[in-house]
A protein has these predicted regions:
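Short, flexible loop/turn motifs enriched in small residues
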Residues: 83, 94-101
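Conserved hydrophobic/aromatic positions in well-ordered beta-strands
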Residues: 103-105, 242
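ATPase catalytic-site recognition across NTP-hydrolyzing enzymes
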Residues: 24-90, 104, 214-217
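Acidic two-metal-ion nuclease catalytic site recognized across multiple nuclease folds
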Residues: 114-115, 204, 208-251
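ATP-hydrolysis module of ASCE/P-loop NTPase motor domains
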Residues: 1-7, 19-21, 39-60, 145, ...
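Conserved beta-strand scaffold positions in the cores of enzyme catalytic domains, especially
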Residues: 18-20, 87-89, 113, 162-164
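ASCE P-loop NTPase helicase motor core
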Residues: 1-44, 109, 130-133, 149-161, ...
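Mg2+-dependent endonuclease catalytic cores in nucleic-acid-processing enzymes, primarily RNase H-like
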Residues: 3, 106-220
Length: 251
């Protein structure tokens, strides 16, 4: 990740002329050494990609979502399946530099991403209602942490079909995922393998930002927002808004 990756393979590649050089094509190198790397680690391993092909690794060692998954999803055309259910996901801001983000997903497409800063509870309620009225979702899901509970309560009172999700609650598969947030991100990662998403740098940075944190039993947790901010990364608001669209099954 970072600017160098963006300049070669990412969102800034159109501004730079770059070339990847296979080490085996360089005069004077010992080809047998590079073949040994391929034989030992596999031809599609990160070791071979970096040491032999002059390419980027598929992901950082602890990165939960690899950049190539996101880039591939950006490159795919929209499916535009009108029969697929529409789900609206809402990640309310917790103050500071965070944004409230509303994501509208229909099947394998992201239909819309809307961001709002500095909005109070009732203003966010209004934005969610606007999205519901426009896209007619089967379900709207809200992260009920922070401002979320008040937003959820107000929308429920007005008889909108909404559900809240607690990121720290128990996963349906607790041996695999440490909490509901990790479970939703796991479902989102699987979805990205065939999805179509817009070219949105903020969304990409959010998706590839968090690291995975397995415990001693191998159960996966995700890096928290405070830990990400300590590393100089923004809160992954757009990715969390997309993730909540996978919280509950929809017909």
């Amino acid at each position: 990740t970072g600017y160098f990756y963006e300049a070669v393979d990412g969102s800034k590649r159109e501004f730079w002329e770059s070339e990847k050089i296979d080490a085996r094509a360089v005069e004077g190198t010992d080809k047998s050494i590079y073949q040994q790397i391929i034989n030992e680690y596999g031809e599609d391993s990160d070791e071979a990609r970096v040491e032999v092909y002059g390419d980027f690794p598929k992901s950082g060692q602890d990165q939960f979502i690899a950049p190539h998954l996101v880039d591939d999803a950006v490159a795919r055309p929209l499916y535009k399946d009108p029969t697929a259910p529409v789900v609206v996901g809402v990640d309310p801001a917790r103050g500071g530099m965070d944004s409230t983000v509303i994501v509208v997903r229909q099947g394998r497409d992201i239909v819309a991403i809307r961001r709002f800063k500095g909005e109070d509870t009732m203003a966010v309620v209004g934005h969610v209602i606007d999205a519901i009225d426009e896209y007619k979702p089967t379900l709207t899901v809200i992260d009920e942490g922070g401002l979320g509970y008040g937003i959820l309560d107000r929308l429920t009172e007005q008889r909108y079909k909404v559900k809240g999700v607690n990121f720290g609650s128990k996963s349906k598969t607790p041996l695999m995922w440490g909490n509901k947030r990790a479970e939703m991100w796991g479902a989102m990662r699987d979805w990205l393998k065939t999805a179509s998403i817009p070219l949105d740098r903020g969304l990409k940075n959010d998706l590839i930002g968090p690291t995975k944190k397995p415990d001693s039993k191998g159960t996966i947790f995700l890096e928290g927002k405070k830990e990400m901010k300590a590393r100089g990364l923004a809160s992954p608001d757009a990715a969390d808004a997309l993730a909540v669209t996978f919280a509950f099954p929809v017909a």
